[in-house]
Amino acid sequence: RIQDRFQTRLNLTAANADEVVRKRVLQKTDTADSSLSIFYGQHEVVLRNLLSFKNAATMHLYSSPASFVSDYPFIPYQFELMGRVLTAIRENAATGLNLSSGERSQLALFMKSAIALKEERIGVLAPVPLFYDALKGFVDSIHATVINRAEEGGVLEAFDVEVLKLLFMIKYIKEIPGNVDNLTTMMVSRVDEDRLALSKKVVASLERLIRETLILRSGD
């Protein structure tokens, strides 16, 4: 289990939020280091083909066994992305609750999301919508109500709601357009994911969300 691969120690003294997360939430045992390095070596090409972005700013992906070990089950681009998401929500869609922009907020996001995956076995990856549960308490009622109604309406599939959460999270982030390629990458949840099948699933969800007037069609 992923849970068995971490040695979690919390000490918020680092200046850099992603380093805080890596050192205090994602620190692995020696045995886990070895297992994850071997796993990466076996799946490096698969991961390279699975994770890609189109017309986006630089989004860092796994670059080596060490990169995979240090960030797993998260993907390197998610650290910078979630920093941008925190800023965007604070500026555009936040409640009156305190949502700081520093390392404590980002640590909380990754810690809660890591806990959600703690029973999973090696091979799972964190999809971006997983972070929404850690964010939703800070989202204003206008935005939160739309997602809550989508969850409770009984018309949409569960995957549709996850896509809706993702679209909300990147709504104000110009560095990563919400095209099908990028949405597909951010919805990846397993190393053995069939990217083509996932892409078709994303397209079907977008069509249903458009039909329910929850989103508008824009570009690709």
Please place each PLM-identified region on the residue numbering.
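Minor-groove-contacting beta-hairpin "wing" of winged helix-turn-helix DNA-binding domains
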Residues: 220
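Short helix/loop capping segments that flank catalytic or ligand/cofactor-binding pockets
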Residues: 19-21, 81-82
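Metal-dependent DNA phosphodiester-chemistry modules and their immediately adjacent helices/loops
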Residues: 20-30
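Short, conserved secondary-structure transition motifs
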Residues: 12-19, 210
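Short, hydrophobic-biased segments on the C-terminal half of alpha helices
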Residues: 203-207
